[in-house]
From Swiss-Prot:
It comes from Clostridium botulinum (strain Loch Maree / Type A3). This is Transcriptional repressor NrdR. Belongs to the NrdR family. Residues 49-139 form the ATP-cone domain. InterPro entries: ATP-cone_dom (IPR005144), NrdR-like_N (IPR055173), RNR_NrdR-like (IPR003796). Negatively regulates transcription of bacterial ribonucleotide reductase nrd genes and operons by binding to NrdR-boxes. The keyword ATP-binding applies. Binds 1 zinc ion. Its cofactor is Zn(2+). A zinc finger (unnamed) spans 3-34. GO terms for molecular function: ATP binding; DNA binding; zinc ion binding. Keywords: ATP-binding, DNA-binding, Metal-binding, Nucleotide-binding, Repressor, Transcription, Transcription regulation, Zinc, Zinc-finger.
């Protein structure tokens, strides 16, 4: 790696440690020519994941869409931002563990609903109403009845 100060191509690693979240490694390097220090980060290169939408179009996986959708469903409910992030983490972990390069929105929705149901039933029904595209109050009531029957 070239030194950002003098562009020399060789350096030595002075310090190396994992970042707080463990997703990358932070390295302090010292240039062997000018002796100046700089920091680099090493991260695993991931394959981009495509999401297959209901209309069969494809777009790149965007974690922010999951978080934003959950924020709306959990608005004014006792669900923390940390819990929302954990659900998004679970979706990413599931996709990663199955080594998928493409995933449909149904699969993502199922993972979200399974996890959200454990945290807050009202948020679950709110999310389900959008995800499953409830057309009328009867569909809404069926979902609530199913939820109540399982409890």
């Amino acid at each position: 790696m070239k030194c950002p100060y003098c562009a020399y191509g060789e350096s030595k690693v002075v310090d190396s440690r994992s970042t707080e979240d463990g997703s990358s490694i932070r390295r302090r390097r010292e240039c062997l020519k000018c002796n100046r220090r700089y920091t680099t980060y090493e991260k695993i290169e991931t394959t981009p994941i495509l999401v297959i939408k209901k209309n069969m179009s494809r777009e790149y996986f965007d974690r922010n869409k999951i978080v934003n959708g959950l924020m709306k469903a959990c608005q004014k409910r006792p669900v923390s931002r940390k819990q929302i992030e954990q659900i998004a983490d679970e979706v990413e972990r599931h996709i990663s563990n199955e080594m998928l390069t493409e995933v449909n929105t149904d699969k993502i929705g199922q993972i979200i609903m399974k996890n959200l149901k454990k945290i807050d039933e009202v948020s679950y029904v709110r999310f389900a109403s959008v995800y499953r595209q409830f057309k009328d109050i009867n569909t809404f009531m069926k979902e609530i009845k199913n939820l109540m029957d399982k409890n």
